[in-house]
């Protein structure tokens, strides 16, 4: 490396010049290239969730990437071989829509954005190994996404079927259930989602439902919140499947329940509107009514239909079933809250013991039969509403008087012996729908042949490359359906004319395995090497937003398990530790009556804010940074003004990483002042060690010991904080040690000062790499600070020769005094009696006895 940029006499740190210089030096020296000659025990894979290349970083990005970078730098100094890569989640609708709007191609738009964002990332001083870079929209990446699809297809884990799907009318594409929010709107466009029946490709994630659920308990270093969200989404239910005969028919209806103890209270059945039996059972007189009902409910999303607050709609099918437990006839209804894809598409109506069923029964005047009562004697107040708790069986034939929990087992045994019930485990989890009717995605490598059916594109013929010269409109069918010369091809099996699949894959398919490709991104023969995956995976620390708890994180877990089943890898889980960082928030100015946002510049009086249009009161609150809310802060502006190290320090110090961070300009200024203070302290201390006249100044051994004590406390505290991801308290400790050392440096020996400032610069370097590098060279070192070892904690240095001796009179603390640890019991007694506190409270009395607790207290009993 070249020499420092600074003059030893400089009293002010100029971040812009220094940071640009060292970023260039690090790149020229390839400082952060990963050592590939490693063993598993000595590796640390630090990974941030890779970004969509929008063209500009936001503060949420900064927080994510800085957290990961601090860990990467720290682990390198701890002697581990660190992999810290970066890439681009670059397929998807935003690029396609941006290309349409700007009349360019998605690839051109994406390449430009990637170039801009790489520059922005480098300005943050991130220790990224750019030789590991991956871009999901490049052929050398999506070739292997297609290869993985082929492996899944070979193993019966990918299939096509006709399905009613969530259709985004704005983006003109299909959405997975996970991509529809609680209001039935698209997660990306915000459009009201519609229902549509199409041939779609699915991945068989349900084959791994039990493993995905069971293995959550092994993810001890994941946030509980994320594990609970995944557990609820997988939705394992242990219960029974009950078979109901249909009156005057050979047909039967099966329904799943977790409450077989309520079977005697089933007073009706409810079918999903697309249940296959409906069209066989419906009277011709009711077909028009049925069609009207179906059209109404098809406008609802699954989440809306399951909502507890929405009134449930239904219609009587005109046919009855038989309750097998008591042989009573019960009506069969169609209900908009029953979803065919969940369970069997039929549910038991038990209004006495289920809130949703109770609401439905009240709406349509259906019978309500209580079969469980509270275990509280004769109190019948429970009859006024649904009773959903445990209790005692009633109206249940031979099971009356039994506790409901015990009755579950007995009724299931009875039903099994009578052939109308059997044990059953179900999951809410549905297979992953990956078909997308858009251009900018990974083509599905399937060829449709009239003779051979669906045929995989041979692995040797991959990738199926997206056509470049294509007109994008954003409307109607997939743009690929217009490229007949691309669609028309030959069947790989029989050689006859055939057509390519025109759907592309969900972008989450590309982002569910990228962490594997980082290991060998230049490998042209395989997507990854199993032996290398064994060395680096699972990722030791993954950092990203909580919004990916279900989509990306669940899909990545599934694909990892699927690839293991296909024999491609050995690991079961992709990420050992997960940190979900909080949002970065800033002040917003909003009219609560109109929900209109205003910029700070539009508010004339911040102390008494008013809507500039209506004069109404403005609400000032912290919200997630957003352009639409006028509260975004451009990282580039902050770096230009204060430097990257200040931005890094602020983002780390302001809040614990898992908590939301409230942006405050004054706090940024505070970090900038600390950077300047750190600079001056190290420079001035270094000057002291080179001051010849200092040899005449009397040094104090106690000050040397104090300096070493302070720096070793800092080593221990900061090491512990980094191990526990508590970056804010680590930086607080940095500030504390600088303040403490500043008071005593003039009385310390040169040897101690040189040792202390070297350690200080080292423990600063993960947080503020630029100033640390500059200071390291300024104090006379040649090799980069980022190639140094993390300082070892010296426990002996923090042990002091003195301690605070507490003086008690009759068991009550009355004072204290510093005492030597080497004093005998008699010396401590003598010292305690002569203190001002003892003299005052003894008031001339002689002690009856004196109790000494070594290195702690003396209790004088009078």
UniProtKB/Swiss-Prot annotation:
GO BP annotation list: leucyl-tRNA aminoacylation
Motif ('KMSKS' region): 624-628
Keywords assigned by UniProt, alphabetized: Aminoacyl-tRNA synthetase, ATP-binding, Cytoplasm, Ligase, Nucleotide-binding, Protein biosynthesis
Binding-site positions, ATP: 627
Catalytic activity of the protein: tRNA(Leu) + L-leucine + ATP = L-leucyl-tRNA(Leu) + AMP + diphosphate
HAMAP family reported in the protein's UniProt record: Leu_tRNA_synth_B
Protein name, as recorded: Leucine--tRNA ligase
Natural source organism: Prochlorococcus marinus (strain NATL1A)
Gene behind the chain: leuS
């Amino acid at each position: 490396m070249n020499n420092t940029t600074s003059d030893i006499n400089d009293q002010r740190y100029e971040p812009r010049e220094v940071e640009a210089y060292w970023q260039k030096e690090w790149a020229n020296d390839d400082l952060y290239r990963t050592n590939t000659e490693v063993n598993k025990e000595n590796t640390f894979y630090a990974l941030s969730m890779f970004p969509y290349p929008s063209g500009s970083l936001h503060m949420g990005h900064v927080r994510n990437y800085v957290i990961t970078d601090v860990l990467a730098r720290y682990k390198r100094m701890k002697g581990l071989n660190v992999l810290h890569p970066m890439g681009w989640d670059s397929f998807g609708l935003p690029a396609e829509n941006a290309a349409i709007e700007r009349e360019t191609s998605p690839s051109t738009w994406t390449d430009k954005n990637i170039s801009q964002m790489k520059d922005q990332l480098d300005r943050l001083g991130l220790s990224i190994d750019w030789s590991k870079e991956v871009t999901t929209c490049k052929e050398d990446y999506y070739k292997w996404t297609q290869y993985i699809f082929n492996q899944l297809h070979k193993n019966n884990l990918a299939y096509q079927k006709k399905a009613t799907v969530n259709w985004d009318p704005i983006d003109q594409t299909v959405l997975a259930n996970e991509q529809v929010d609680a209001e039935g709107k698209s997660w990306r466009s915000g459009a009201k989602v519609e229902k549509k029946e199409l041939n779609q490709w699915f991945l068989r994630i349900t084959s791994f439902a039990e493993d995905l659920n069971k293995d959550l308990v092994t993810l001890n270093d994941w946030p509980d919140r994320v594990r609970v969200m995944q557990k609820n989404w997988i939705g394992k239910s242990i219960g029974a499947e009950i078979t109901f005969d249909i009156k005057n028919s050979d047909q039967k209806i099966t329904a799943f329940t977790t409450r077989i103890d309520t079977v005697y209270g089933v007073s009706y059945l409810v079918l999903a509107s697309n249940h296959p039996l409906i069209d066989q059972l419906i009277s011709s007189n009711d077909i028009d009514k049925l069609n009207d009902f179906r059209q109404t409910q098809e406008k609802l999303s699954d989440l809306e239909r399951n909502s507890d607050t929405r009134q449930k709609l239904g219609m009587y099918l005109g046919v009855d079933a038989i309750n097998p437990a008591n042989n009573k006839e019960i009506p069969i209804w169609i209900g908009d809250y029953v979803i065919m894809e969940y369970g069997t598409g039929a549910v038991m109506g038990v209004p006495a013991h289920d809130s949703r069923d109770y609401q439905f029964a009240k709406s349509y005047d259906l019978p309500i039969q209580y079969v469980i009562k509270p275990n509280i004697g004769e109190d019948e107040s429970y009859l006024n509403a649904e009773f959903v708790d445990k209790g005692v069986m009633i109206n249940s034939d031979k099971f009356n008087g039994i506790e409901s929990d015990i009755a579950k087992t007995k009724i299931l045994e009875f039903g099994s012996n009578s052939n109308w019930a059997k044990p059953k485990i179900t999951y809410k989890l549905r297979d992953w729908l990956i078909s997308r009717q858009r251009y900018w995605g990974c083509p599905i490598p399937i060829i449709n042949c009239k003779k051979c059916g669906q045929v995989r594109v041979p692995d040797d013929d991959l990738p199926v490359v997206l056509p470049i010269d294509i007109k994008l409109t954003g409307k109607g069918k997939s743009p690929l359906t217009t490229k007949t010369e691309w669609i028309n091809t030959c069947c790989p099996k029989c050689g006859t004319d055939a057509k390519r699949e025109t759907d592309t894959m969900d972008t989450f398919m590309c982002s569910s395995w990228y962490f594997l490709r980082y290991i060998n991104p230049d490998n042209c023969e395989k997507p990854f090497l199993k032996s290398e995956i064994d060395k680096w995976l699972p990722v030791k620390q993954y950092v990203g937003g909580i919004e990916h708890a279900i989509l990306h994180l669940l899909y990545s877990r599934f694909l990892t398990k699927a690839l293991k089943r296909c024999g491609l890898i050995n690991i079961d889980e992709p990420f050992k530790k997960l940190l979900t960082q909080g949002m970065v928030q800033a002040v917003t100015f909003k009219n609560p009556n109109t929900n209109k946002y205003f910029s700070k510049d539009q508010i004339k009086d911040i102390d008494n804010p008013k809507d500039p249009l209506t004069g109404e009161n403005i609400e000032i609150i912290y919200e997630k940074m957003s352009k639409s809310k006028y509260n975004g802060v451009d990282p580039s502006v902050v770096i230009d003004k204060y430097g990257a190290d200040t931005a890094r320090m602020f983002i780390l110090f302001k809040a614990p990483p898992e908590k939301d961070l409230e942006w405050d300009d004054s706090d940024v200024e505070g970090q900038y002042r600390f950077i300047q203070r750190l600079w001056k302290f190290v420079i001035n201390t270094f000057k002291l060690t080179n001051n010849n006249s200092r040899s005449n100044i009397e040094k104090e051994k106690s000050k040397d010991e104090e300096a070493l004590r302070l720096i070793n406390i800092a080593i221990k505290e900061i090491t512990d904080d980094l191990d526990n991801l508590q970056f804010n308290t680590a930086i607080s400790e940095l500030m504390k040690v600088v303040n403490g050392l500043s008071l005593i440096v003039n009385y310390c020996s040169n040897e101690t000062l040189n040792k202390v400032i070297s350690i200080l610069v080292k423990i600063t370097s993960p947080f503020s790499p630029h100033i640390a590098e500059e200071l390291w060279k300024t104090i006379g070192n040649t090799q980069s600070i980022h190639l140094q070892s993390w300082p070892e904690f010296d426990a002996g240095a923090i042990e002091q020769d003195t301690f605070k001796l507490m003086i008690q009179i009759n068991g009550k603390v009355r004072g204290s005094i510093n005492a030597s640890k080497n004093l005998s019991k008699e010396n401590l007694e003598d010292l305690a009696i002569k203190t001002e506190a003892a003299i005052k409270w003894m008031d001339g009395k002689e002690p009856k006895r004196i109790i000494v607790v070594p290195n702690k207290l003396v209790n004088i009993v009078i």
